[in-house]
Amino acid sequence: MSQLKVGFCRLDVTPPLGIRLMGNNNIRRAENILDALEISVMALECGETKVLLVSMDALYPYEHAYIRQTLSEKFGIPQEAIFVHGTHIHTGPMIDRHFGSPESPVAAASVALQTPDLDKDIEKIVSYTKVFLNKVVDAADY
């Protein structure tokens, strides 16, 4: 009988104040921090079978395919065994590597993107997304 091995890591991914928030199709920015935003990763291994469970404080896990592919390549776990979940939080930033471009699912879904600060928003969101995605890998590597 194989032994079940379990690993768990939780990392803080609280964004900087002023970043644009996602949800309700309104332009809102982070003005304060009530609770930290987090990424949690649980790794399960039993014999040859490995599974990763990724939970992230985000409205939607738009980057789920990228996360699954990246973790699969790094750890040799089939993408079908990597489960990505968003907590559907309406007080967190957008997680979108392509924000501001036609490839962005967020841009396609939002009618309220045009603001005087859009260029700054794009830069902040893309930058935060890179940090966020790196922390997903860090948590899985823990």
Locations of the language-model features?
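Conserved beta-alpha junction segments in alpha/beta enzyme cores
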Residues: 1-142
